């Protein structure tokens, strides 16, 4: 049986010469010319739209005396806050139910450097309020860098120590 298949394959190979099929795929010159034409048309259309938008005299936006539109004048109020509220009712904290929030004058973002802690190689500057005494189990060393809400969550969980291996 194997000899039959082998003989038939040899006869077919002798009568029909082996030629490679020329399949260009994406390297076919006709396809490249077609894609170049599409890319050229796309470039012309985008350039025309850009020039039309740049040089057209459409409706002018009303300009205030300061030279900016009214939308931007509301934002340029002369003072700079980290997170400025766009709401007209400034100072109301949505997390407190819209109640007025009072700022402490000494409420800053960071504590000052302390000379005695600078002796440690890996000391860090803590946030104000971190050194306050908290209610809990007294594991403040475990909870460094966590917010008060996260610390309370960890205090509420009963953490068991793992047995030694």
Swiss-Prot record:
Chain positions found as Phosphotyrosine: 72, 83, 110, 122, 143, 154
Primary location recorded for the protein, binned into one broad class: membrane
Topology in membrane: Single-pass type I membrane protein
Stretches of the chain found on the membrane's Extracellular side: 22-30
Location of the ITAM domain: 61-89, 99-127, 132-160
Residue stretches spanning the membrane: 31-51
Ranges for region Disordered: 86-108, 125-144
UniProt name for this protein: T-cell surface glycoprotein CD3 zeta chain
PANTHER family: T-CELL SURFACE GLYCOPROTEIN CD3 ZETA CHAIN
GO molecular function: protein homodimerization activity; transmembrane signaling receptor activity
Family, as annotated: Belongs to the CD3Z/FCER1G family.
Keywords: Adaptive immunity, Cell membrane, Disulfide bond, Immunity, Membrane, Phosphoprotein, Receptor, Repeat, Signal, Transmembrane, Transmembrane helix
Cytoplasmic side: 52-165
An annotated GO BP: T cell receptor signaling pathway
Pfam families in UniProt: ITAM, TCR_zetazeta
Stretch forming the signal peptide: 1-21
Comment, domains: The ITAM domains mediate interaction with SHB.
Protein's cellular compartments: Cell membrane
Record text on subunit structure and interactions: The TCR-CD3 complex is composed of a CD3D/CD3E and a CD3G/CD3E heterodimers that preferentially associate with TCRalpha and TCRbeta, respectively, to form TCRalpha/CD3E/CD3G and TCRbeta/CD3G/CD3E trimers. In turn, the hexamer interacts with CD3Z homodimer to form the TCR-CD3 complex. Alternatively, TCRalpha and TCRbeta can be replaced by TCRgamma and TCRdelta. Interacts with SLA. Interacts with TRAT1. Interacts with DOCK2. Interacts with SLA2. Interacts with SHB. Interacts with ZAP70. Interacts (tyrosine phosphorylated) with SHC1 (via SH2 domain). Interacts with PTPRC.
UniProt keyword GTP-binding present: no
Post-translational modification note: Phosphorylated on Tyr residues after T-cell receptor triggering by LCK in association with CD4/CD8.
Function: Part of the TCR-CD3 complex present on T-lymphocyte cell surface that plays an essential role in adaptive immune response. When antigen presenting cells (APCs) activate T-cell receptor (TCR), TCR-mediated signals are transmitted across the cell membrane by the CD3 chains CD3D, CD3E, CD3G and CD3Z. All CD3 chains contain immunoreceptor tyrosine-based activation motifs (ITAMs) in their cytoplasmic domain. Upon TCR engagement, these motifs become phosphorylated by Src family protein tyrosine kinases LCK and FYN, resulting in the activation of downstream signaling pathways.
Cellular component GO terms, alphabetical: alpha-beta T cell receptor complex; Fc-gamma receptor III complex
Superkingdom in the source lineage: Eukaryota
Sequence ranges of Basic and acidic residues compositional bias: 86-98
């Amino acid at each position: 049986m194997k000899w039959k298949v082998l003989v038939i394959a040899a006869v077919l190979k002798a009568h029909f010469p082996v030629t490679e099929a020329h399949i260009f795929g994406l390297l076919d010159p006709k396809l490249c010319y077609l894609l170049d034409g599409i890319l050229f048309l796309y470039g012309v259309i985008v350039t025309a739209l850009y020039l039309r938008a740049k040089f057209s005299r459409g409706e002018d936006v009303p300009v205030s005396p300061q030279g900016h539109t009214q939308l931007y004048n509301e934002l340029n109020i002369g003072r700079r806050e980290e997170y400025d509220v766009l709401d007209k009712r400034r100072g109301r904290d949505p997390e407190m139910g819209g109640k007025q929030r009072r700022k402490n004058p000494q409420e800053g973002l960071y504590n000052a450097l302390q000379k005695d802690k600078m002796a440690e190689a890996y000391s860090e500057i803590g946030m104000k309020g971190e050194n306050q005494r908290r209610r809990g189990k007294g594991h403040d060393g475990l909870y460094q860098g966590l917010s008060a809400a996260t610390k309370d969550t960890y205090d509420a969980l009963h953490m068991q120590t793992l047995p030694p291996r």
